[in-house]
């Protein structure tokens, strides 16, 4: 059995200090993909806010949308990175 091929895609954006819902249009193309992939097309999804891995119960991902399930948005300027890992 040879090496397992994987793909690692990253969706980057920054918090405006107000929103809890982010869409494809919030993605910053210079840093990564601008498309939020649907969970059924990837093997794993990880969310990092300011570099800290977030527990899965704190967010929902669907095709084109990230919803933060918190009553407070991240501080303005906080980095939001959604990592998609695809194991082929």
Predicted regions, residues:
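Extended beta-strand solenoid/passenger and fiber regions
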Residues: 1-46, 53, 82, 88
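Glycine-rich loops and low-complexity Gly/Arg-rich segments
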Residues: 46-49, 71-73
């Amino acid at each position: 059995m040879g090496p397992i091929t994987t793909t690692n895609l990253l969706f980057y954006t920054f918090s405006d200090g107000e929103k809890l819902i982010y869409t494809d249009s919030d993605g910053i193309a210079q840093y990564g993909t601008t498309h939020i992939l649907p969970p059924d097309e990837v093997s794993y999804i990880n969310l990092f806010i300011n570099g800290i891995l977030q527990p899965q119960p704190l967010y929902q991902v669907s095709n084109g949308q990230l919803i933060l399930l918190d009553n407070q948005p991240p501080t303005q300027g906080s980095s939001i990175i959604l990592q998609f890992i695809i194991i082929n």
